[in-house]
């Protein structure tokens, strides 16, 4: 009984903001304090240069340090830049919620985040034969593209079953462990996003064991700011999400470009994610 009284508020808080669990971005809200999350993300994408499907696996561990601070640690493995699926490096992400205004059926939150990555990929894919298209890519990221750091702010508004969130961030790309950042690639970029999530089911909440069905649409933009490669793009990423027992979720998302002038090796990505959360890992004393 005591355990139920402790865990139930955590599950209720997760349910109340279930439509904030965006697939392509992070909300300003955090996971419950002292909770542990295990996540596996698989991405499938057509590589324009090779004309074949690339795959990236991202195992991730998440920890709710407190109600205001959470940390993610992720590994990366892919065949995007290597001849086969190889480890690419790792990243660490931290988010601190500095503003929270809660009402009965709504809340507004703001948070700051920082991310760092160490990547061992080359900046140009390994050549196996000469039958491929010329490699044209001006997009870098911290998910296998380049080592570097990023930081920014997130604001999220929840109103009943609808959650709207916006992100503005700065990225500084650096040399990879074995390769120098090419002079023709921008070392600086700005990222921005606008995300909406809607809780479709259940229509009436009766138990934390009910399955949640959430629908999302996210606009994801990036602009390189260095004069050597000043270009931009805006993508759209619709997604569907299932949450079971308020602790386990499955995400399905598709991302494609709306418009832009940035040369890219990948324009379309299909994402499958599995996540499981364990609440109250560290029990309170007394």
Task: Briefly describe each language-model feature range.
Residues 18-61, 119-123, 133:
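Short glycine/proline- and aromatic-enriched beta-strand/turn motifs that initiate or cap beta-hairpins
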Residues 26-33, 68, 100-110, 161, ...:
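Short loop/turn motifs that connect adjacent beta-strands in outer-membrane beta-barrel proteins
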Residues 29, 42, 63, 96-98, ...:
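Residue-level signature of outer-membrane beta-barrel architecture
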Residues 32, 53-57, 85-90, 143-149, ...:
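Residues that define the transmembrane beta-barrel architecture of outer-membrane proteins
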Residues 38-42, 73, 94, 110-114, ...:
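Membrane-embedded beta-strand positions of outer-membrane beta-barrel proteins
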Residues 42-46, 75-81, 98, 114-120, ...:
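Transmembrane beta-strands of outer-membrane beta-barrel pores
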Residues 83-189:
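Outer-membrane pore/translocation modules
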Residues 91-94, 194, 266-286:
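Outer-membrane beta-barrel "beta-signal"
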